[in-house]
């Protein structure tokens, strides 16, 4: 066959440019894969624990699967430029300059995405112990002016940005050097047209199509391939920043879709959850139960104050983690005097999700700023108290517009919603922050409301939500408590967490403790129930695999006046979660009132086979003293929970005992969907 120099036929320029693009993008993909591999190693050594190295097979599987994801996503990003250059080869006029510029820009964009999203994913894992997910998108609802100070408060933020700039510049420089060298080599290549089609087009496209799928089997790489181990630290290595962002966005979009709830689905869930079939009557009311009749409660309804505290981690209240320093402030004595449940889990690792789960019994966190924001839900905690004759008040240290909380919770039965703007009007001395105001003043405001009702004209149900212990961890000027020299065992755990977070943690706990002391030192002591828990644990600390439940745990504190206590002494060491708070408060404060039957009264004895004898967290299910980690909606092999809330190193060899808890999330979703669908149906009626 006649051999033709590519510079000899009329498509010469386009052919040369195609080869330049193919070889340059190949080098670019190899370079980006190396960068992502180094990012994984950095994540492993920065955040994973030495004990995890024993899982060597899983580690290599994670690195290999991650490499496959890297190749697949990089090829998919680069394929447009390659295909465009192939299409231009037979063109009778040169498009070389345009195609080359477009691919040059595409390559630069890929480099920037790879490096900066790798750092974002690295930092996200350090703070949340998981790759970028839907929270990164739902958090945008807070606004850039709120999010940016929070992001910049991450440990060594400037160093991370500087490293990204240096690596980006070095990558651009290296790619330019390689491109110039490749161009010189290509000009010397001689190839016949058939050889060119086979070796320069057909074979590369075949390789690209295989690597772009990430697999030669029937199924290409997908979401399910992100789980390669029962070890969270190992699974965190699999997705690169681009993949994590992609699946996070898909999850975020999916969370906004609320499908209609069918009666058949509800009945199947009812039987799976409660262990017996529903009757033929209307299904929705059967998900409710009633508190016991009590003449005493009817004649003496107590005030109920539920405090939801930002990032109130239980670990920092334990000397096993914090050392010999008191991070509870004045709250410490109340933890000793009253009920303190120390093996307790939040519903989620996110304020908004925990908030709507606890107060509205829904898993749709975006509901407060969705088209369903005005739909009143019967599963709302405020509505249960209103039905019992209570005045309902929400006092929030943050801005009212965050996630549309003011409007939404008023739609869910709160008579009054007081946020940072109103608090600033009432208390001019209050300093503002990116999130709102200072926690001290929500407790002052709650006490004022309770004082006005000291004679008991109408009982109050009050919910508070603090914000001070949130990045960027700005301690209010009124915060006079100081932490003595911090123990090394605690400082060693602060991987991405600034030391200032310990000051704000102490500040809020102390303010809560002072509020409880004021109640106990007043006539309100006899008729005010006080509960407190964390919306989620503190994030960014270092924990090993055996400490995963400690990593997410929050305390549940409960003060009950003597006259309202039962003779039964509750087990404060039982494993419980957010789902059990409201049933406990309902049964302690209310007589003959219907409420969603979704949790247990922690002050009553509980049998092992009880429907509600499990603890629920979005990522964990604890049932029968075994903890099951959820990863991509898959329940992994359980680990035994020790009395100190530590997990065994190895998974349990016993059969899974998931109990009723595995249906809990689906039940919450069905209840919300049913109510929204019912409301829409009523609206459509003439």
Could you tell me what each predicted segment is?
Residues 231, 238, 243, 247-292, ...:
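The feature marks either
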Residues 275-686:
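Solvent-exposed soluble domains appended to multi-pass membrane proteins
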Residues 51-58, 128-136, 149-156, 257-269, ...:
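General structural signal for secondary-structure boundaries
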Residues 2-257:
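Transmembrane and membrane-interface helices of multi-pass
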Residues 66, 70, 149-150, 173, ...:
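Residues that form generic nucleotide/phosphate-binding pockets
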Residues 4, 16, 20, 57-58, ...:
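Generic alpha-helical secondary structure signal
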Residues 94-98, 108-109, 127, 204-209, ...:
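A broad, low-specificity signal for short, low-complexity segments enriched in glycine/proline
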Residues 97-98, 257-267, 371-374, 598-600:
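Short alpha-helical "patches" and their helix-cap loops
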């Amino acid at each position: 066959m006649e051999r033709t120099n590519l510079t000899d036929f009329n498509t010469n320029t386009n052919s040369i440019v195609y080869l330049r693009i193919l070889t340059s993008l190949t080098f670019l993909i190899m370079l980006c894969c190396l960068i992502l591999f180094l990012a994984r190693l950095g994540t492993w050594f920065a955040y994973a624990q030495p004990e995890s190295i024993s899982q060597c097979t899983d580690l290599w599987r994670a690195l290999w699967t991650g490499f496959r994801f890297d190749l697949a996503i990089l090829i998919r990003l680069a394929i447009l430029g390659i295909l465009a250059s192939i299409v231009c080869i037979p063109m009778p006029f040169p498009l070389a300059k345009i195609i080359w510029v477009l691919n040059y820009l595409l390559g630069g964009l890929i480099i920037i995405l790879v490096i900066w999203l790798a750092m974002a994913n690295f930092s996200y894992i350090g703070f949340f112990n998981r790759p970028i997910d839907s929270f990164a998108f739902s958090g945008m609802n807070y606004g850039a002016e709120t999010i940016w100070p929070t992001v910049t408060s991450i440990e060594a933020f400037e160093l991370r940005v500087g490293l990204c700039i240096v690596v980006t510049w070095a990558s651009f420089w290296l790619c330019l050097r390689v491109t110039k060298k490749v161009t010189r080599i290509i000009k010397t290549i001689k190839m016949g047209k058939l050889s060119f089609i086979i070796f320069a087009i057909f074979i590369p496209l075949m390789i690209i199509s295989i690597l772009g799928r990430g697999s030669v089997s029937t199924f290409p790489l997908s979401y399910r391939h992100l789980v390669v181990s029962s070890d969270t630290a190992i699974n965190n290595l699999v997705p690169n920043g681009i993949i994590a962002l992609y699946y996070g966005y898909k999850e975020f979009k999916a969370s906004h879709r609320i499908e209609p709830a069918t009666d058949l689905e509800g009945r199947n869930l009812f039987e799976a959850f409660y262990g017996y079939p529903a009757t033929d009557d209307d299904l929705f009311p059967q998900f409710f139960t009633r508190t016991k009749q009590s003449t005493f409660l009817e004649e003496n309804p107590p005030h109920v104050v539920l405090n939801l505290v930002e990032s109130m981690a239980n670990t920092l209240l334990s000397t096993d983690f914090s050392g010999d320093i008191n991070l509870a402030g004045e709250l410490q004595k109340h933890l000793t005097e009253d009920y303190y449940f120390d093996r307790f889990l939040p519903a989620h690792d996110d304020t908004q999700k925990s908030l709507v789960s606890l107060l509205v019994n829904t898993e749709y966190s975006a509901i407060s700023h969705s088209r369903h924001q005005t739909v009143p839900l019967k599963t709302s905690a405020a509505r249960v108290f209103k039905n019992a004759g209570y005045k309902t008040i929400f006092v929030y240290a943050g801005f009212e517009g965050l996630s549309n909380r003011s409007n939404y919770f008023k739609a869910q039965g709160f008579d009054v919603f007081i946020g940072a703007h109103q608090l600033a009007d009432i208390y001019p001395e209050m300093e503002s922050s990116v999130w709102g105001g200072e926690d001290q003043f929500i407790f002052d405001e709650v006490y004022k409301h309770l004082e006005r009702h000291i004679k008991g004209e109408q009982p109050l149900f009050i919910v508070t939500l603090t914000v001070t212990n949130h990045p960027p961890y700005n301690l209010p000027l009124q915060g006079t408590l100081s932490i003595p020299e911090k123990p090394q065992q605690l400082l060693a755990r602060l991987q991405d967490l600034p030391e200032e977070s310990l000051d704000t943690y102490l500040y809020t706990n102390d303010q809560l403790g002072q509020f409880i002391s004021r109640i106990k030192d007043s006539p309100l002591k006899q008729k005010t129930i006080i509960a407190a828990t964390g919306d989620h644990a503190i994030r960014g600390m270092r924990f090993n695999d055996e400490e995963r439940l400690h990593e997410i745990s929050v305390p549940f504190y409960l003060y009950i006046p003597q006259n309202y206590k039962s003779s039964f002494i509750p087990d404060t060491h039982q494993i419980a979660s957010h789902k059990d708070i409201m049933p406990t408060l309902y049964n302690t404060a209310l007589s003959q009132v219907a409420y969603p039957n979704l949790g247990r009264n922690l002050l009553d004895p509980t049998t092992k086979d009880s429907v509600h004898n499990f603890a629920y967290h979005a990522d964990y299910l604890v049932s029968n003293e075994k903890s099951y980690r959820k990863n991509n909606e898959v329940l992994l092999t359980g680990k035994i929970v020790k009395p100190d809330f530590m997990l065994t190193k190895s998974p349990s060899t016993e059969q899974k005992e998931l109990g009723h808890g595995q249906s809990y999330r689906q039940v919450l979703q069905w209840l919300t969907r049913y109510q929204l669908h019912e409301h829409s149906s009523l609206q459509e009626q003439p």
